[in-house]
Amino acid sequence: VLNACYDVGIVKFFNSLKWSTMSTIIVDKIAKSFGATQAVQDVSFEVRPGEIFGLLGPNGSGKTTSIRVILDIYQPDSGSVTILGGPMTNEKLNQIGYIPEERGLYQDVPLDRCLTYLATLKGLTEEQITERLPKYLAKFDLTDHAKKKAKELSKGMQQKGQLIAALIHDPEIVIIDEPFSALDPVNTQLVKDLLIEQRNAGKTIVMCTHQMNQVEQLCDRLVLIDHGRVLLQGELSEVFDRFRTNEVIIDSLDPLPEELNGVSRIEQLNGGYRLTPQAGLSAHQLLDELLAQGIKLNSFEVAVPTLDEIFIKVVKEGNGKHE
């Protein structure tokens, strides 16, 4: 009996470790078409425990189809999806919290009853719901609105209600589409803090959004898809490094002349200039050139492209390949 208990303990121990050593979601060369429309083609990416992963792309790019394949709503025409070490099962579905872009609260049911019902579908007991639901309602400042029907709530309140529905069963994976829609700045920060809290707890978070500033602040890695194909993926820092240029932004004490040695292009900005060095000249060498020409500087910094700029550039280049 002791040996049996020991063996069971070992199994539980290694089961508790397994998601820290492998990807929780593996999407491998999936393809999905609807009639003559190829929605997704040869899409591959992995999502790891303890990270916020950005799934990005323009409208109609294939993001939603990819999510529905992951959730086993759609069967792929080819390729495969591995969830928590294997194929999707009903048990694994209960380890996923999903918020679609189309909101899903029952409009004619009081919020607390709706959330209780949804939590029951995810396998929570009455005791667990009684313990957890009041805490989440308080966290999202919804306690005083719990008896209101969803249709009586603002869009922001409904969004927070859906977040509760997605998180109350403590899932391993959270997939959330446009998490900040309809939220004011205070509640946006609340949701950001919550996502970071989930990441720090080792959860896997997949976030679809068009708000690139939120991706920059939250995501560890990302994939960008368009026309159903992967255009770009990697760690956020790697993506920025890949698109970094030698362009610099300066603020000078005096207006710049129209031409400068070592500079191929001068663009006037609001309160400064963007300079493009001549070919083969580094930003550091350009600084030396400017100082040698007597340019007096208040500031000098290497220009880092925003994720918005990278997004637009990559999508435009991708569209060019499809023309």
Protein language model features and the residues they cover:
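ABC transporter nucleotide-binding domains
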Residues: 23-25, 32-226, 232
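N-terminal non-cleavable signal-anchor helices
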Residues: 2, 9-12, 28, 41-44, ...
